[in-house]
């Protein structure tokens, strides 16, 4: 009990100190010019980076979600038990989860940016991030599907429903809270990612004209400001906005899961 109490206190104090430090140093530096439509060296606006982050998140999730959920459905509902291919996919997914983001960035730079000739672009960054979060979505969806009782499937088959109808009408609805949690986790990782995007999306602090334009997300914007050493106040202000976004994502996932569970 004592060790548990110490662990809880240490975790709460560490989190409180981190959040407090960022808020104290960042809130006083939040000024209207930081939300100017165009970035300049005078205003160091974060608005283009914020909009780029939204586009990057949407595009990466649009790519990753169908593949992640589809793969999980196949492994749980269609593949035979003990299938070696399924085991290989699971091991691969677990391995991909532990790979540092810088490695994903190097892969994205060599494959998407150079080999596929996409250049430093929104699309190259989104494709790299979709590969990065694919194991998260796939594994959480798989666990959510496995948590659905087999009696649901047996009852559906007993009433004459086919496999496809059973999966989409009977199995998926109870699994939606777990699937949503995985998507929210993926979203949080995308929003906070820096290393992979430096090598694939670039650091241009302007809104993209199209998916082949170089972009800078909020996390990369904060890194660029702090690394230059001339915009530390603006970097702290950016950290506050990024922290608020991540907290809202986490709170939103909890709220959505509770609402879905009610129905």
Language-model-detected regions and their locations in the chain:
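N-terminal signal-anchor/first transmembrane alpha helix
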Residues: 1-20
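Periplasmic/extracellular loop-to-transmembrane helix junction in inner-membrane transport proteins
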Residues: 1-3, 21-60, 82, 224-233
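Interhelical loop and adjacent transmembrane-helix boundary motif
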Residues: 42, 197-243
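Transmembrane-helix boundary motif in ABC transporter permease subunits
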Residues: 60-93, 106, 254-258
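Transmembrane alpha-helices
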Residues: 61, 163-199
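Generic hydrophobic transmembrane alpha-helix motif, especially the helices
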Residues: 94-129
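Glycine/proline-centered hinge or cleavage motifs at structural transition points of membrane proteins
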Residues: 100, 159-160, 173
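C-terminal transmembrane helix and the adjacent membrane-cytosol boundary/short C-terminal tail
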Residues: 146, 184, 224-263
């Amino acid at each position: 009990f004592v060790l548990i109490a110490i662990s809880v206190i240490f975790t709460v104090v560490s989190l409180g100190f981190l959040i407090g430090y960022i808020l104290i140093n960042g809130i006083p530096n939040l000024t209207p010019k930081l939300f100017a439509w165009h970035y300049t060296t005078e205003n160091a606006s974060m608005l283009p980076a914020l909009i780029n982050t939204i586009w990057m998140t949407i595009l990466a999730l649009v790519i990753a979600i169908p593949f992640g959920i589809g793969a999980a459905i196949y492994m749980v509902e269609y593949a035979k038990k003990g299938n070696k291919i399924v085991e290989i996919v699971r091991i691969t997914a677990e391995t991909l989860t532990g790979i540092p983001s810088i490695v994903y960035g190097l892969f994205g730079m060599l494959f998407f940016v150079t080999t596929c000739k996409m250049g430093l672009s929104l699309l190259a960054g989104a494709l790299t991030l979709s590969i990065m979060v694919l194991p998260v979505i796939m594994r959480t969806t798989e666990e959510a599907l496995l948590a659905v009782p087999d009696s649901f499937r047996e009852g559906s088959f007993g009433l004459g429903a086919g496999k496809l109808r059973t999966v989409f009408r009977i199995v998926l609805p109870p699994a939606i809270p777990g699937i949503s949690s995985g998507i929210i986790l993926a979203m949080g990782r995308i929003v906070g990612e820096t290393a992979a995007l430096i090598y694939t999306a670039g650091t241009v602090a302007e809104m993209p004209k199209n998916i082949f334009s170089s972009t800078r997300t909020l996390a990369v914007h904060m890194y660029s400001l702090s690394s230059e050493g001339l915009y530390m106040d603006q970097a702290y202000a950016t950290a506050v906005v990024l922290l608020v976004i991540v907290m809202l994502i986490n709170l939103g996932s909890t709220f959505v899961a509770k609402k879905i569970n009610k129905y």
